[in-house]
């Protein structure tokens, strides 16, 4: 919590100070009320008291109560403002930190866990602020102030209050000790539950196709039952708190009246009325002490989970991306554009893991096409993901326009690259928003530029067929488009940026052969100045590449043109002849 407290802004500290001041004022007013109760009690017990004499203390008491009410409302207002303001920028900080994470950091937490930390854990912090500013300040202030008021009244009554406070503190300590370890487990199980739910929903068609509803239900029920069991354990512990506190409160009242009865019985007749008045006042103050601890007890119900949430949030905020901008970024010579060179590149996901790609070297001049082919898991996608620095190389270096990619400002480097991932990603909004996405030297795009990009990507026809055209709605994930249409829109988005380098990470896989062939022909004609790196499974997609790298278990086992590899490389031959006939391969059909 100390780390999170450092993120509170000056304005929020100001509102917190006002909250404390109004809380003190409210407590002061509430603690003044028993004084007038005592005065009214004495007046009632005094023979011959006129009814008019009661109005003055009664009106003052009502006035104090109204002021205390207004002060409490003000405290609630400021507490809500602070909680909302703080969690707004805390949520924003987490979101921006996650956006800066490389794939390594995202895999470390997992997407469901990051979602839980950004939503549920933040809500726990907001609840703590809302309750805490009203309870944490009010409880101790009221308890201490009330104890100060009753000091010197009667040591017997005072001992009753002290014993009640000690029992209260012991109970709270025991409950916190039992509940706190369970809260950490609950949060982890909540992550697991979210992961299972997300997995089931995203793969719902596969689940239904394999009649696996019962299997997924069982997985969910097991995780859900475990979360429920622990939540019940914690909630039952917390449920004990209120009855025990009520018992302490009732016991304290009984003790005060019992002790008071003995004291008043032993006093002279003239002293009995003042003693009774003192007992009424003491009783009011004692109840204020108990209420103070009741308020703090209410906070302890949410505190264990909030502390766990704070730790989980700090884990995200304390972790910095392994992909960092250089302190003194370099710029490339403007005379060189689109040149890519890999020099003995090796990559491992961690220092102790096996290399995913090893000793890869090649050079692509501006406008050339370099293709990568190999079996599943051979490292093709990982290799091209190193260029825009989604990961950093473990050994060797990658040069773009003669400059090491790690020496570029990240924004400048990624402005040079148009990236089309394996799974086409479309964002909710409209077609126009998906094409004019992010920052690049070309933004904001004109509609003419968008239509040109759509035409290049063979997407113009099906967008024109839509009534709203570029303003056509795109739901999350682009579910109103087919897989091939989504891929073509993703290609159009990259082309619209007019980058120096295009990376196609198996981006033709959902296209039919005819569209694939037409698209490749158009790209070859219209993007001659752009360097193209193509990861593909189909031989037909890469036959015309200037250079083809054959990968097997992360190593380059062949390098050359289609004809050269077809004549000399066994791995390439095996892939090629499994897809096309000898005539198609030799004549490039």
What are these regions (language model features)?
Residues 98, 220, 313, 342-344:
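Conserved catalytic Walker-motif region of ABC-type ATPase nucleotide-binding domains
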Residues 21-22, 29-42, 64-111, 115, ...:
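Juxtamembrane helix-loop junctions of ABC transporter transmembrane domains
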Residues 10, 14-74, 78, 151-156, ...:
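Transmembrane helix-loop-helix hairpins at lipid-water interfaces of multipass membrane proteins
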Residues 11, 15-28, 32, 130-186, ...:
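Transmembrane helices of ABC transporter permease
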Residues 10-13, 100-104, 120-129, 133, ...:
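An intracellular "coupling" helix at the cytosolic face of ABC transporter transmembrane type-1 domains
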Residues 50, 149-166, 233-312, 316-317:
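Helix-loop-helix
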Residues 333-589:
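ABC-type nucleotide-binding domain
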């Amino acid at each position: 919590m100390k780390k999170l407290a450092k993120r509170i802004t000056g304005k929020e500290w100001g509102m917190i100070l006002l909250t404390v001041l109004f809380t003190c004022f409210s407590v002061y007013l509430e603690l003044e009320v028993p004084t007038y109760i005592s005065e009214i009690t004495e007046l009632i017990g005094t023979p011959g008291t006129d009814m008019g004499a009661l109005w003055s203390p009664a009106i003052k008491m009502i006035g104090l109560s109204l002021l205390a009410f207004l002060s409490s409302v003000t405290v609630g207002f400021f507490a809500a403002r602070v909680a909302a303001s703080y969690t707004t920028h805390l949520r924003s900080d987490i979101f921006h930190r996650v956006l800066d994470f490389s794939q390594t950091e995202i895999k470390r937490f997992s997407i469901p866990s990051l979602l839980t930390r950004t939503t549920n854990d933040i809500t726990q912090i907001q609840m703590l602020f809302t309750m805490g500013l009203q309870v944490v300040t009010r409880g101790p202030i009221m308890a201490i102030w009330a104890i100060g008021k009753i000091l010197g009244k009667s040591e017997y009554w005072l001992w009753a209050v002290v014993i009640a406070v000690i029992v209260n503190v012991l109970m709270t300590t025991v409950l916190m000790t039992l509940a706190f370890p369970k809260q950490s487990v609950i949060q982890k199980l909540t992550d697991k539950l979210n992961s299972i739910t997300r997995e089931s929903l995203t793969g719902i068609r596969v689940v239904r196709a394999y009649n696996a509803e019962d299997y997924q239900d069982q997985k969910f029920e097991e995780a859900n039952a475990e979360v429920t069991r622990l939540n019940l354990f914690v909630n039952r512990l917390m449920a004990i708190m209120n009855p025990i506190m009520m018992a302490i409160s009732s016991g304290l009242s009984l003790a005060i009246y019992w002790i008071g009865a003995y004291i008043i019985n032993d006093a002279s007749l003239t002293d009995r009325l003042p003693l009774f008045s003192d007992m009424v006042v003491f009783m009011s103050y004692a109840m204020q002490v108990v209420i103070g601890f009741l308020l703090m007890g209410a906070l302890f119900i949410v505190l264990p989970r909030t502390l766990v949430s704070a730790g989980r949030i700090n884990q995200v905020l304390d972790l910095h991306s392994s992909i960092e901008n250089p302190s003194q970024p370099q710029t490339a010579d403007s005379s060189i554009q689109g040149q890519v060179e890999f020099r003995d590149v090796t990559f491992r996901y961690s220092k102790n893991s096996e290399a995913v790609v090893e000793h890869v070297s090649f050079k692509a001049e501006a406008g050339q096409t370099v293709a990568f082919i190999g079996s599943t898991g051979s490292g093709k996608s990982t290799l091209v993901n190193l260029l825009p620095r989604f990961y950093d190389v473990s050994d060797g270096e990658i040069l773009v326009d003669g400059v090491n990619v790690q020496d570029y400002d990240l924004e400048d480097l990624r402005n040079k690259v148009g990236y089309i991932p394996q799974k086409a990603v479309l964002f909710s909004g409209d077609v126009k928003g998906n094409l004019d996405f992010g920052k690049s030297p070309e933004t904001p795009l004109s509609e003419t530029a968008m239509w040109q990009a759509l035409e290049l990507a063979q997407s113009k026809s099906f967008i024109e067929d839509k009534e709203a055209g570029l303003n056509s709605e795109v739901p999350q994930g682009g579910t109103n488009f087919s897989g091939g249409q989504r891929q073509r829109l993703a290609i159009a988005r990259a082309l619209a940026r007019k980058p120096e380098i295009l990376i196609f990470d198996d981006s033709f896989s959902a296209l039919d052969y005819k569209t694939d062939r037409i698209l490749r022909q158009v790209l070859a004609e219209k993007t001659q100045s752009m360097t193209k790196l193509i990861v593909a499974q189909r031989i037909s997609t890469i036959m015309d590449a200037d250079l083809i790298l054959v990968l097997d278990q992360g190593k380059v086992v062949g390098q050359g043109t289609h004809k050269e590899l077809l004549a000399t490389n066994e791995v390439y031959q095996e892939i090629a002849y499994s897809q096309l006939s000898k005539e198609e391969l030799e004549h490039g059909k």
